[in-house]
């Protein structure tokens, strides 16, 4: 049966093609701010019970789409699936965030690292991708919106692997980077190979765009960022399948705190660059000069403001970018668990409505 994508606005925006309006999706759009997500998570018993069960992962992936007219679905998973598949023993303790039972800190630890067999260790992820694609598609082969796959970046994965969890200052991983760069590069090399294989497996399973989350790239100094993060993102991008089933598969990279390096990130071969809220979107568009699309960049805490302020700030982001192709509206980071779903509805409505006016010249 031929498959038809009913809403391809997101994919066309990533490829800098004209669209009738600005598409929107939200980082962490399936998450704790939704009561239905919390109900599903309670049934699953734990976060990992949710993420590692394709049925539950599919259910929560679709929840925000059933509530809001978003323009893309994103696979429900976690960025730490790869190091978990490497045998580091991922666990989530209530109120503590992710922890690894076996952090990577010594020469012997690094020597044991290997690229995991994706089918064998991460089949639950590719299974979820296939199941979500089916759930997005009706009996006539019509798919509602595209599905985004994702991974953490090699550096961001290394931060958690070496620290053994989250960190305020990343002193353990940074100390390794400066005192034993040979070990750091060995970790990053394995991670880059694993991330590329993982994203390609998601593409083969049906992901129609992929995103690399470099959450902690901005923790690095200039120079160190290029050596320990950007170079390895470039390696990943060079290995990715850019076409599947006759369709292009766009690639997005997001470095939180990476606005300083926008031009360099845009030169890695990606189709789009995600931006946090510290960057002026109009200036960023001029800096990349049409080489890539841009994704972002509303401060997620604006969603705590009254609806009129949410709408005003959404218009400000759209006005900053201007009436040009190549913009995907998003937050500058993941949505807070304390956000009101009603305010998200206001945001999505304003982005769609106001961007249509911009296209027609009726805004103002």
UniProtKB/Swiss-Prot annotation:
CDD domains: URO-D
Entry-linked Pfam families: URO-D
Main location (coarse class): cytoplasm
Site (Transition state stabilizer): 78
SUPFAM superfamilies xref list: UROD/MetE-like (SSF51726)
EC numbers on record: 4.1.1.37
Lineage top rank: taxon: Bacteria
Residues binding substrate, per UniProt: 28-32, 78, 160, 215, 333
GO biological process: protoporphyrinogen IX biosynthetic process from glutamate
Recorded metabolic or biological pathway in which this protein acts: Porphyrin-containing compound metabolism; protoporphyrin-IX biosynthesis; coproporphyrinogen-III from 5-aminolevulinate: step 4/4
Gene Ontology terms, MF aspect: uroporphyrinogen decarboxylase activity
PANTHER family: METHYLTETRAHYDROFOLATE:HOMOCYSTEINE METHYLTRANSFERASE RELATED (PTHR21091), UROPORPHYRINOGEN DECARBOXYLASE (PTHR21091:SF169)
Subunit structure: Homodimer.
Stated role: Catalyzes the decarboxylation of four acetate groups of uroporphyrinogen-III to yield coproporphyrinogen-III.
Family listed: Belongs to the uroporphyrinogen decarboxylase family.
Protein name from the UniProt record: Uroporphyrinogen decarboxylase
Species, as recorded: Burkholderia vietnamiensis (strain G4 / LMG 22486) (Burkholderia cepacia (strain R1808))
């Amino acid at each position: 049966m031929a498959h038809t994508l009913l809403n391809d606005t997101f994919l066309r925006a990533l490829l800098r093609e004209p669209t009738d309006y600005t598409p929107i999706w939200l980082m962490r759009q399936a998450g704790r701010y939704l009561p239905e997500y919390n109900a599903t998570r309670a049934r699953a018993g734990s976060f990992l019970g949710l993420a590692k069960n394709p049925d539950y992962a599919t259910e929560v992936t679709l929840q925000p789409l059933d509530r809001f007219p978003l323009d893309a679905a994103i696979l429900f998973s976690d960025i730490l699936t790869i190091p978990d598949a490497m045998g580091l023993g991922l666990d989530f303790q209530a109120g503590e965030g992710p922890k690894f039972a076996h952090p990577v800190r010594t020469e012997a630890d690094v020597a044991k690292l290997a690229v995991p067999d994706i089918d064998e260790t991460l089949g639950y992820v590719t299974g979820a991708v296939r199941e979500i694609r089916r759930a997005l598609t009706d009996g006539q082969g019509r798919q509602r919106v595209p599905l985004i796959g994702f991974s953490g970046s090699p550096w961001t994965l290394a931060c958690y692997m070496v620290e053994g969890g989250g960190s305020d200052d990343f002193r353990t991983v940074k100390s390794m980077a400066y005192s034993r760069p040979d070990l750091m590069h060995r970790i990053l090399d394995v991670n880059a190979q694993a991330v590329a294989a993982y994203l390609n497996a998601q593409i083969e399973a049906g992901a129609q765009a992929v995103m690399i989350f470099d959450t902690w790239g901005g923790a690095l100094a200039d120079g160190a960022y290029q050596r320990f993060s950007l170079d390895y993102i470039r390696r990943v991008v060079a290995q990715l399948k850019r076409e599947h089933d006759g369709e292009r598969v766009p690639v997005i990279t997001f470095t939180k705190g990476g606005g300083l390096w926008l031009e360099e990130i845009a030169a890695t071969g990606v189709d789009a660059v995600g931006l946090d809220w510290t960057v002026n979107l109009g200036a960023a568009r001029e800096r990349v000069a049409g080489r890539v699309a841009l994704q972002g960049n509303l401060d997620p805490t604006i969603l705590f403001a009254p609806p009129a302020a949410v709408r005003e700030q959404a218009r400000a982001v759209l006005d900053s970018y201007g009436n040009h192709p190549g913009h995907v509206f998003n937050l500058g980071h993941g949505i807070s668990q304390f956000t009101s779903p009603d305010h998200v509805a206001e945001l999505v409505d304003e982005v769609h409505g106001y961007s249509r006016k911009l296209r027609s010249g009726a805004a103002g």
